[in-house]
Amino acid sequence: MLCGTPVLAEYPDKPVTFLVPWPPGDLEDVLTRMIAEDFQAEHGVAAAVVNKPGGGGGPFPGAIEVANAPADGYTVGSFVIAVPVIGHKIDIPDLAPAKFDPLGIFLTYPFVLAASANAPYNSMEEMAEHAKSNELALGHFGAPLIPTRVSLAYAKTAGFEWGSEAAFDALDCNTLASGDADVINTTLQLVLPCLDDIKILASITDERIPLTPDTPTLGEVDPRLSITLWNGLFVHKDTPQEARDKIIASAKKTMLSERAQKLAKDTGAAVYWTDAKASAAQIVADQEAMGSLGELLQ
């Protein structure tokens, strides 16, 4: 009579994958690796980060992989704001309707707009004026992504057009030094090695970044463009609560740890843990903000 009753193993009993849809090295990757290391140490199963850069597709190819994996807690997505906010609205069948629930948001990026040191402008306003009579190339992480849309919206509100724009897997010191782009939107982490050799024109953050205190936020330049860029952990909506709870408990401890907070201090990022309910509310608020941004771009 009991033969047909499966015995469910306690989670986790096999390796756990944390999928980061970007190349190694940026903040979400570094922090997710900390999460995986601590989860492995706590639970005694292998836990590893797998990087799945999407090229011009940004984080969405990686998100598709998480969406199509079994909803058992063994594949966890480490996703930027764009995946839950717009991923199910941009004609990607595998991501619609919305597939993911947040476990928690843990990172606010020190996102910036940067130019090379020899650029003939020192501010967003000067750059806009220069761009009215000179073609400037914008480098970004993907056309649908929020930093890209903010950069395009700024051009529209400031009365100029980008000469060209292109997506890159990584936007760093080499992107500017090689001349592949005149202006890039990227994270401060990726340009820290050359911070003294470039110009930070604005930050796409809610407050000024401590490492660049003289640089205004884009919201200071134009209040309509005030938005925060974050990263969080996500699982498929059908993932069991037991798995969610264990991932959350471990990740929260990691984010509040000394090494995670040191990374925040060193890079200008904000590192914290926002619970699932508050994260879901943040996503709703950001969807409304994206609607307003879309109206600016029409």
Label each region the model flagged.
Residues 8-98, 134-135, 143-147, 155-185, ...:
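N-terminal (or domain-start) structured segment
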Residues 13-16, 157-160, 241-298:
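An extracytoplasmic/periplasmic, membrane-proximal ligand-sensing/linker region
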Residues 19, 103-104, 113, 166, ...:
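Hydrophobic/aromatic beta-strand patches that form the interior of the parallel beta-sheet core
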